[in-house]
Amino acid sequence: GQPIAQSKAAMRRALRSMQPGDTFQVIRFSENASALGPDPVPATPDNIRRALKYADSLEGSGGTQMIEGVRAALAFPHDPGRLRFVVFLTDGYIGNEDQILGAVHQHVGPARIFPFGLRSSPTRHLMDRMAILGRGVVGYLGLNDSATDVMDGFFERVSHPALTDVRIELLGVESPAGATVGVDVFPRVSRDLFVGRPVIITGRTDAG
């Protein structure tokens, strides 16, 4: 149907947006998870063609067990020479939110997570929290949205981050009486700053 067609269109656009020197992997998840191969592969023309064929062969089946996809996507060893972007595409209602968020929190490491929900069915709270924990950005595609246009915009943003590993720390804040006060900042570890996507930081002091 329309959701799987949108998913395939988004995957095709993402694969064709790979740059020389990139590596990638494609993971399918429903009741279980399966992958294009055991490890990320270089973005060579042959590997991209193989991945496009794999993506075209995918069909929707069963329920949406996102936990299997999360575990599979975050299980690859970290490459200190690369910044890993994990893009999740789903159109299903997703249960076991606490288990999924716990797995993301435990295994995300330095990876960035970008969840994309198709139609109105995905659980927005879960998608939003995954993006926060993964220091990424959440996106939603309606039935009339172009998956190609959405993925083009996504790659345009993430290909040119203005700042990465943004951390906020305030020291020596004084109250009107001159006393040093404590400060709470949220989030302490922010997502990366991308062009056209402002980062919002909030703070609260003991002084109110």
Q: Where on the chain are the PLM-derived regions?
A:
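Exposed acidic/Ser/Thr-rich ligand/metal-binding surfaces
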Residues: G1-G208
